[in-house]
Protein backbone atom coordinates (compact mmCIF):
# COMPACT_ATOMS: atom_id res chain seq x y z
CA UNK A 1 0.00 0.00 0.00
CA UNK A 2 2.83 2.40 0.94
CA UNK A 3 0.76 5.42 2.01
CA UNK A 4 1.91 8.37 4.12
CA UNK A 5 0.00 8.20 7.41
CA UNK A 6 0.20 10.33 10.54
CA UNK A 7 -1.11 8.56 13.63
CA UNK A 8 -1.97 10.82 16.57
CA UNK A 9 -2.26 8.70 19.70
CA UNK A 10 0.27 6.06 18.65
CA UNK A 11 1.64 5.87 22.19
CA UNK A 12 -1.77 4.91 23.57
CA UNK A 13 -3.21 1.65 24.84
CA UNK A 14 -4.86 0.84 21.51
CA UNK A 15 -2.94 3.14 19.18
CA UNK A 16 0.37 1.34 19.56
CA UNK A 17 -0.88 -1.94 18.15
CA UNK A 18 -2.74 -0.26 15.31
CA UNK A 19 0.37 1.74 14.43
CA UNK A 20 2.57 -1.36 14.38
CA UNK A 21 0.23 -2.98 11.88
CA UNK A 22 0.07 0.14 9.71
CA UNK A 23 3.88 0.23 9.66
CA UNK A 24 4.06 -3.11 7.87
CA UNK A 25 2.81 -1.58 4.62
CA UNK A 26 3.11 2.20 4.97
CA UNK A 27 5.23 5.22 5.78
CA UNK A 28 4.07 6.03 9.29
CA UNK A 29 4.58 9.34 11.07
CA UNK A 30 4.05 9.69 14.81
CA UNK A 31 4.04 12.53 17.32
CA UNK A 32 4.63 12.18 21.06
CA UNK A 33 2.63 13.84 23.82
CA UNK A 34 3.94 12.98 27.31
CA UNK A 35 4.85 9.30 27.24
CA UNK A 36 7.47 8.02 24.81
CA UNK A 37 7.85 4.29 25.43
CA UNK A 38 5.66 3.10 22.56
CA UNK A 39 6.80 5.96 20.34
CA UNK A 40 10.41 4.84 20.73
CA UNK A 41 9.36 1.30 19.86
CA UNK A 42 7.61 2.49 16.70
CA UNK A 43 10.64 4.55 15.66
CA UNK A 44 12.82 1.45 16.02
CA UNK A 45 10.38 -0.36 13.75
CA UNK A 46 10.70 2.35 11.10
CA UNK A 47 8.23 5.11 11.98
CA UNK A 48 9.23 8.73 11.52
CA UNK A 49 8.67 11.21 14.33
CA UNK A 50 7.48 14.78 13.90
CA UNK A 51 8.01 17.22 16.75
CA UNK A 52 5.15 19.64 16.08
CA UNK A 53 1.91 19.80 14.13
CA UNK A 54 3.43 22.53 11.96
CA UNK A 55 5.53 19.86 10.25
CA UNK A 56 2.32 18.44 8.76
CA UNK A 57 2.51 21.14 6.08
CA UNK A 58 5.71 19.57 4.75
CA UNK A 59 4.31 16.04 4.40
CA UNK A 60 2.12 14.75 1.58
CA UNK A 61 -0.22 12.94 3.95
CA UNK A 62 -2.68 10.47 2.48
CA UNK A 63 -4.33 9.82 5.83
CA UNK A 64 -4.40 11.19 9.36
CA UNK A 65 -5.57 8.80 12.05
CA UNK A 66 -6.60 9.96 15.48
CA UNK A 67 -7.11 7.79 18.57
CA UNK A 68 -7.14 9.83 21.78
CA UNK A 69 -8.64 9.65 25.25
CA UNK A 70 -11.82 11.69 24.89
CA UNK A 71 -13.83 14.21 22.87
CA UNK A 72 -12.37 17.45 24.33
CA UNK A 73 -8.82 16.32 23.51
CA UNK A 74 -9.83 15.27 20.00
CA UNK A 75 -11.53 18.61 19.32
CA UNK A 76 -8.50 20.52 20.58
CA UNK A 77 -6.25 18.57 18.20
CA UNK A 78 -8.69 18.95 15.29
CA UNK A 79 -8.65 22.72 15.63
CA UNK A 80 -4.85 22.71 15.51
CA UNK A 81 -4.31 20.36 12.59
CA UNK A 82 -7.24 21.18 10.29
CA UNK A 83 -5.67 24.39 8.89
CA UNK A 84 -2.43 22.50 8.20
CA UNK A 85 -3.85 19.60 6.19
CA UNK A 86 -4.29 19.44 2.44
CA UNK A 87 -7.83 18.70 1.29
CA UNK A 88 -6.60 15.46 -0.28
CA UNK A 89 -5.93 13.98 3.17
CA UNK A 90 -8.48 11.57 4.62
CA UNK A 91 -9.03 11.93 8.38
CA UNK A 92 -10.08 8.74 10.18
CA UNK A 93 -11.09 9.31 13.81
CA UNK A 94 -10.83 6.18 15.96
CA UNK A 95 -11.72 7.98 19.20
CA UNK A 96 -14.73 7.00 21.33
CA UNK A 97 -16.77 10.23 21.39
CA UNK A 98 -19.68 11.62 23.33
CA UNK A 99 -22.97 11.87 21.42
CA UNK A 100 -22.11 15.25 19.85
CA UNK A 101 -18.37 14.74 19.44
CA UNK A 102 -18.29 13.24 15.96
CA UNK A 103 -20.56 15.95 14.57
CA UNK A 104 -18.38 18.67 16.12
CA UNK A 105 -15.26 17.05 14.69
CA UNK A 106 -16.82 16.79 11.23
CA UNK A 107 -17.82 20.46 11.29
CA UNK A 108 -14.23 21.48 12.08
CA UNK A 109 -12.79 19.58 9.11
CA UNK A 110 -15.67 20.52 6.80
CA UNK A 111 -14.63 24.17 7.08
CA UNK A 112 -11.40 23.24 5.32
CA UNK A 113 -13.05 20.82 2.87
CA UNK A 114 -11.20 17.87 4.41
CA UNK A 115 -12.83 14.44 4.30
CA UNK A 116 -13.61 13.20 7.80
CA UNK A 117 -14.87 9.76 8.80
CA UNK A 118 -15.08 7.91 12.11
CA UNK A 119 -14.14 4.36 12.92
CA UNK A 120 -14.17 3.62 16.66
CA UNK A 121 -12.93 0.10 17.27
CA UNK A 122 -14.01 -2.90 19.31
CA UNK A 123 -11.44 -5.09 21.03
CA UNK A 124 -8.55 -4.89 23.43
CA UNK A 125 -4.84 -4.20 23.30
CA UNK A 126 -4.24 -7.82 22.29
CA UNK A 127 -6.62 -7.60 19.33
CA UNK A 128 -4.99 -4.32 18.35
CA UNK A 129 -1.55 -5.93 18.26
CA UNK A 130 -2.86 -8.95 16.34
CA UNK A 131 -4.69 -6.73 13.85
CA UNK A 132 -8.09 -8.33 14.45
CA UNK A 133 -10.16 -5.42 15.80
CA UNK A 134 -13.73 -4.64 14.81
CA UNK A 135 -14.51 -1.26 13.25
CA UNK A 136 -17.76 0.71 13.55
CA UNK A 137 -17.45 3.02 10.55
CA UNK A 138 -19.43 6.13 9.65
CA UNK A 139 -19.06 9.02 7.22
CA UNK A 140 -19.35 10.03 3.57
CA UNK A 141 -20.20 6.77 1.78
CA UNK A 142 -17.88 7.72 -1.07
CA UNK A 143 -14.99 7.37 1.41
CA UNK A 144 -15.84 3.91 2.71
CA UNK A 145 -13.66 1.92 0.30
CA UNK A 146 -10.76 4.33 0.74
CA UNK A 147 -11.09 4.02 4.52
CA UNK A 148 -10.98 0.23 4.29
CA UNK A 149 -7.54 0.40 2.67
CA UNK A 150 -6.18 1.68 5.99
CA UNK A 151 -8.51 -0.07 8.41
CA UNK A 152 -7.95 -3.51 6.90
CA UNK A 153 -4.41 -3.45 8.26
CA UNK A 154 -5.65 -3.81 11.86
CA UNK A 155 -9.35 -4.69 11.60
CA UNK A 156 -10.86 -8.12 11.01
CA UNK A 157 -14.38 -6.76 10.49
CA UNK A 158 -15.57 -3.32 9.36
CA UNK A 159 -19.25 -2.45 9.85
CA UNK A 160 -20.68 0.51 7.92
CA UNK A 161 -23.28 2.31 10.07
CA UNK A 162 -23.84 5.19 7.65
CA UNK A 163 -23.35 8.61 9.25
CA UNK A 164 -20.71 9.63 11.78
CA UNK A 165 -23.49 10.11 14.34
CA UNK A 166 -24.84 6.57 13.87
CA UNK A 167 -21.35 5.07 14.19
CA UNK A 168 -20.80 7.05 17.40
CA UNK A 169 -24.10 5.80 18.86
CA UNK A 170 -23.28 2.23 17.82
CA UNK A 171 -19.93 2.41 19.60
CA UNK A 172 -21.46 3.72 22.83
CA UNK A 173 -24.21 1.10 22.76
CA UNK A 174 -21.61 -1.61 22.16
CA UNK A 175 -19.57 -0.37 25.11
CA UNK A 176 -22.74 -0.27 27.20
CA UNK A 177 -23.33 -3.95 26.47
CA UNK A 178 -19.67 -4.79 27.16
CA UNK A 179 -19.67 -3.02 30.52
CA UNK A 180 -22.93 -4.67 31.58
CA UNK A 181 -21.83 -8.20 30.66
CA UNK A 182 -18.36 -7.74 32.14
CA UNK A 183 -19.78 -6.48 35.44
CA UNK A 184 -22.20 -9.41 35.55
CA UNK A 185 -19.41 -11.95 34.95
CA UNK A 186 -17.24 -10.40 37.68
CA UNK A 187 -20.09 -10.44 40.20
CA UNK A 188 -20.93 -14.00 39.14
CA UNK A 189 -17.49 -15.27 40.12
CA UNK A 190 -17.23 -13.10 43.23
CA UNK A 191 -20.49 -14.60 44.46
CA UNK A 192 -19.31 -18.11 43.63
CA UNK A 193 -16.15 -17.58 45.65
CA UNK A 194 -18.13 -16.40 48.68
CA UNK A 195 -20.43 -19.42 48.36
CA UNK A 196 -17.48 -21.79 47.87
CA UNK A 197 -18.65 -22.97 44.45
CA UNK A 198 -15.98 -24.43 42.14
CA UNK A 199 -15.06 -21.85 39.49
CA UNK A 200 -13.95 -24.29 36.79
CA UNK A 201 -17.10 -26.40 36.98
CA UNK A 202 -19.27 -23.29 37.13
CA UNK A 203 -17.55 -21.86 34.05
CA UNK A 204 -17.93 -25.08 32.06
CA UNK A 205 -21.62 -25.23 32.99
CA UNK A 206 -22.19 -21.56 32.12
CA UNK A 207 -20.72 -22.06 28.64
CA UNK A 208 -23.56 -24.46 27.86
CA UNK A 209 -26.29 -21.95 28.68
CA UNK A 210 -27.53 -18.60 27.40
CA UNK A 211 -25.16 -16.82 29.80
CA UNK A 212 -22.19 -17.73 27.61
CA UNK A 213 -20.45 -14.64 26.20
CA UNK A 214 -17.17 -13.22 25.01
CA UNK A 215 -16.73 -11.49 28.36
CA UNK A 216 -17.23 -14.77 30.20
CA UNK A 217 -14.54 -16.50 28.17
CA UNK A 218 -12.02 -13.67 28.34
CA UNK A 219 -12.35 -13.22 32.10
CA UNK A 220 -12.94 -16.76 33.34
CA UNK A 221 -10.25 -18.68 31.45
CA UNK A 222 -7.48 -16.65 33.07
CA UNK A 223 -9.15 -15.87 36.41
CA UNK A 224 -9.50 -19.58 37.16
CA UNK A 225 -5.71 -19.90 36.97
CA UNK A 226 -5.16 -16.76 39.08
CA UNK A 227 -4.67 -14.21 36.29
CA UNK A 228 -7.14 -11.35 36.74
CA UNK A 229 -6.05 -9.37 33.67
CA UNK A 230 -8.04 -11.25 31.08
CA UNK A 231 -10.19 -8.18 30.45
CA UNK A 232 -8.15 -5.01 30.91
CA UNK A 233 -10.16 -1.81 31.12
CA UNK A 234 -9.23 1.19 33.22
CA UNK A 235 -11.51 2.80 35.78
CA UNK A 236 -11.07 6.18 34.08
CA UNK A 237 -12.17 4.78 30.70
CA UNK A 238 -15.13 3.04 32.32
CA UNK A 239 -16.24 6.30 33.94
CA UNK A 240 -15.81 8.20 30.67
CA UNK A 241 -17.85 5.65 28.72
CA UNK A 242 -20.62 5.50 31.32
CA UNK A 243 -20.82 9.29 31.31
CA UNK A 244 -21.10 9.34 27.51
CA UNK A 245 -23.61 6.47 27.52
CA UNK A 246 -25.79 8.17 30.14
CA UNK A 247 -25.81 11.36 28.08
CA UNK A 248 -26.79 9.39 24.96
CA UNK A 249 -29.65 7.48 26.61
CA UNK A 250 -31.00 9.90 29.22
CA UNK A 251 -33.83 11.22 27.03
CA UNK A 252 -35.10 7.84 25.84
CA UNK A 253 -38.60 6.83 27.04
CA UNK A 254 -37.28 4.04 29.30
CA UNK A 255 -34.59 6.19 30.93
CA UNK A 256 -34.90 6.82 34.65
For each predicted feature, which ranges?
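Hydrophobic beta-strand scaffold residues
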Residues: 28, 49, 116-117, 158, ...
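Interdomain hinge/lid region at the active-site interface
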Residues: 168, 214-256
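NAD(P)+-binding Rossmann beta1-loop-alpha1 motif at the extreme N-terminus of oxidoreductases
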Residues: 1-59, 63-66, 125
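Rossmann-fold NAD(P) dinucleotide-binding segment
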Residues: 53-116
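Hydrophobic residues within alpha-helices
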Residues: 14, 18-19, 105, 150, ...
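Rossmann-fold dinucleotide-binding core
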Residues: 8, 97-175
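Active-site-proximal catalytic alpha-helix in oxidoreductases
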Residues: 130-138, 159, 163-195, 204-218
